Amino acid sequence: MQTYTTQMDAARKGIVTPQMETVAKKEYRTVEEIRQLVAEGKVAIPANKHHTCLDPEGIGSMLRTKINVNLGVSRDCKDYNIEMQKVMSAVNMGAEAIMDLSSHGNTQPFRQKLTHECPVMIGTVPVSYTHLTLPTT
């Protein structure tokens, strides 16, 4: 039974997660080094439980720099499938993170597709999403 809610929570309880083990291998560090860095808040391992195909990465002190790609649906490009092709191209070329900057239309289906099909870290910019949900006057 899982007794933690976040990677930091686990690390502070002395628990090594499968995500920490993966990050340790990728970063050529011991699992205990990674656990300690996460516990101290020097490393983050984004690992949302809804991101079912995630291949975890660590971000922070003493780790490799990661490649991030910005994309998303917009007024000019509304086709989710085209954006997903861009996502997979970016991943195949070595991107380790995708920042979803979607700014037009119903963006939730695109984000759900990302979390089910994209194996790298995913981030969003809440301010970009906020203007889509505010009532118009």
Locate each region found by the language model.
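Active-site mouth loops of central-metabolism enzymes
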Residues: 66-82, 132
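Glycine-rich, proline-tolerant flexible connector loops at the mouths of alpha/beta enzymes
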Residues: 34, 38-39, 44-56, 71, ...
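Alpha-helix-loop-beta-strand connector modules within alpha/beta enzyme cores
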Residues: 61-67, 108-127
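Conserved small/polar residues in nucleotide/adenosyl-binding loops
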Residues: 130-136
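Catalytic domains of carbohydrate-active enzymes, especially glycoside hydrolases
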Residues: 85-98
